[in-house]
Amino acid sequence: MCKFRLVVSTLFLLALGACSTVQVGRDFDLSAFESRVQRGVTTQVQVRGWLGAPAGMGVAVDTGGERFDEWTYYYGVGQLPDMTDARLKVLQIKFDRNGVVRGYDWSGEGK
């Protein structure tokens, strides 16, 4: 998870160096997601309907050995030369083997 964020952040910063305004990924409304999602109820089909296809898909394994499908959504935008205005947000969602949301975490822009 941390490696993915590092890779996305690095790609974002490299892209910012290539032109004056750069957008990476597809923007999403975190507040709208949080108001809709219900752990143990919401399905992959519903999440895809709200947010579209994930930017990345993988597998996470917890300390007890349980495996989860993990979907990642990210969005970044920035403008040179003032890098202080660059924004990056990442949402990672974990699903159980039945495709139901078990949990999620995000970084970047909050509510």
Report residues per predicted region.
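Bacterial N-terminal signal peptides that target proteins for export
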Residues: 1-8
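C-terminal motif of bacterial Sec signal peptides marking the signal peptidase cleavage site
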Residues: 15-18
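Residues within mature, well-folded domains
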Residues: 20-111
